[in-house]
Amino acid sequence: MFARIESYLRFWRRRFSRNEWAIRHLGLTPVEGKSEEPGLLLIQIDGLARRQLEAAIAKGRMPFLKKLQERGHYSMHTFYPGQPSSTPAVQGELYYGVRAGVPAFSFLDRESKRIAVMFRPEWVKKFESGFQAQAEGLLKGGSSWSNIYSGGAAPEETHFCGSSIGFGDMWRTGKIRNIFIFVLLQFPAVVRIAGLLLLELAIAIPQAIRGVFRGQWIMREFGMLVSRVCIGIGLRELVTIGGQVDVTRGLPAVHINFLGYDELAHRRGPGSLFAHWSLSGIDRAIKDLYGAAHRSTRRDYHVWIFSDHGQERTRSFATEFPGGVEKIIADCMETPREKDPQRRPRSQQGVHAPALSRSSHAERRRAREQAANALTEEETKTFSVAAMGPVGHVYFAHPMDDTQKRALALRLVKQGKIPGVLFRDRSDRVWWIHEQGETAVPDGASALLAGHPASLRAEIARDLDTLCKNENAGDIVLLGWGNNGAWTFAAERGAHAGPGLHETQGFLLVPPGTRLPADSTAFVRPSDLRAAGRAFLGHAPLESSHHAGARTETHLRVMTYNAHGCSGMDGRVSPRRIARVVQQQSADLIALQEIDHGRSRSRSEDQAALIAEALGYHVVFCPTVMHGHSGRYGHALLSRWPIEVIKVAELPGAPDSWWPEPRGALWARIEVNGVDINIVTTHLGLSPRERVIQMRALLGNDWLGPIISSEPVILCGDFNLSPGSVPYALAASKLRDVQAAREGHRPRSTFSSMHPFMRIDHIFVSSHLETERAFVPRNDLTRIASDHLPLLADLSFPSASDLTT
């Protein structure tokens, strides 16, 4: 009854959903008939180091992410971005599996002899086309929001990305028209965005003025004001709404990137209050996206939340050394350079958003950008530098031999105070010149990374070697990171791209039970996340894997769960969703009640087999109700280990029962670490007298009576009875209720899932089993997957030798 009411209410909510209206009136194509297929929502917080996330959570700036972790819904992993630790390289590896596909955010494209900036559509398209020739994009068939690349998404599904922000792209794909329709359909959201923009503007203008009076460059301060308002608020709200529409449509993969924190952290530093201010809004946006994904009726979505890299608090060569790094290089090379009064050094030039319009002003601006990308006459005679961060690439007009490179690198470190210089010799070996001397890469580089986690050192060293061997890497590569602190070559206070401690440690939040590559236990890198995503979407298998959040303790986790025919509170029949509940909790033994087998109401599926297949578990089905040719109905037992069936039988009923439905029980024995565990799963009747008769039978000589005192026993299921009833007292007289076994534990109700008020699902255990923990997970998934909540117990048991003794 409760499920029908909730399903009815959800139906009418969908009818009046603005997301559904947007799908209909924007001419978007929903994906139908795929409700049981997986969907992946990737949410990226650009530039947020794991350390900064933990600090923000501790200060209460991200309450939703805190809730996800504290309630056990998500486990946190370190996300290592590779080298360079910048978004274009990370997303190239994430989408296409190409490591160090580009050597930096800005570098010299040796083919065209022009400076590439991985924010301009022409460069993004060029390099992404090369990646696409090597592998299929992770987002194929899906959508990409506010990223560098499309990731394989179609042009019409690529929004505010580096590859599709040109006006022509937006016009051809109909996005300009859709913006106007969007304003009409999402008018409340538009009003809210406008209000947020005005509020942020009121806060930002005084702060920008204060920055100017403190000596900051006026154009940078007001450029930051625009970034804060347009990217931190406007773009965040637009991609959030767009992402909600896309998961409502049922696209297989959706990737949304929030840029606001990264932009502000570059300006003021990654730990600044200024940058952390943006995280509260991002947290709320993630909450909205998470809710939309779990409400979607067209896909079974997983939501993975990550940051592509962190940032380091830095000092700047551009602001502390007149002439910047270009002047330092020229002095060390003893090469006089003519200063162009009309042009600042490249390392001191800002990055401007590309012009979108076709006006004459925009055309002139594009022409200036094209000219700026070309090497100057002076650069073609001496050297050029691409250094938009803590990694700088230096390209010589005239080749240098190994001796010359080494001598220059030593001068840059000793005389120019550059923390480190990498170069590749003629034998294809990479060397790292630093204050202490020189080190071969990757062999000796781990020793220079002693402050990093041990698991990361060798990986960073290998990636630095790969970076230097990129075809577009500099003849020498400057590193701003060293033992004496972090420096950047651009005018910024927060930076990333190198091997610093925090820039190499982002974060990844995934539900427990998520399958990750087996070698990603210490950290997850972009190619690992790609492999996990492709496996989850069914595109490619994981050759070997581990479960995120899996326990290592030697104990048993038991779950009992009334699955309600796998029919959720939204009216959707989904065995896959029930499997997700089990997977999230990493249960070892699972007793499921109300499982269909071959019934027309559930697509004639074998639900127990489908759930077991999704988990890779053993399964036994116990039918209790036969519907002739229309299938069977009963309960099932799933296990990580082989199942030995001892007995399957019908339980006695009461002749005068007002609902005379057949009831049965399944008794199985499972060997765990050499110990035989007896488990009986059942679903008792609805009348009080019937339940008393059935409980006496289960505890009698034909069932568990003879072994309760001598062997480990678990009796679990939906008993349709509450504590204090006669049959409960019968069970408690010989076995222990796991929810009453531990002092201080407050028993939790399991029915109904939306508003639990009854404790009718139970796990009883014999004295051989110690209850370490009993809990009822209540989250967005368990509230909707069935009309009951699952009950779990962590049980410890003595060894086989102790039992024998």
Located regions from the model:
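Alpha-helical membrane-targeting segments
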Residues: 1-30, 168-235, 345-373, 377, ...
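His/Asp/Glu-rich, glycine-adjacent segments
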Residues: 3, 13, 93-269, 390-393, ...
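Active-site nucleophile/metal-coordination loop of metallo-enzymes that catalyze phosphate/sulfate
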Residues: 10-39, 49-174, 185, 337-374, ...
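A long, amphipathic alpha-helix that forms part
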Residues: 15, 233-234, 238, 246, ...
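Beta-strand elements within well-structured catalytic alpha/beta cores of enzymes
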Residues: 35-54, 68, 253-259, 275, ...
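Active-site neighborhoods of enzymes that stabilize oxyanions during catalysis
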Residues: 119-132, 141, 145-152, 348-532
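Metal-dependent active-site segment of extracytoplasmic phospho-/sulfohydrolases and closely related
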Residues: 285-322, 431-433, 477-479, 707-730
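Active-site regions of metal-assisted phosphoester/phosphodiester hydrolases
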Residues: 545-589, 613-614, 618-805
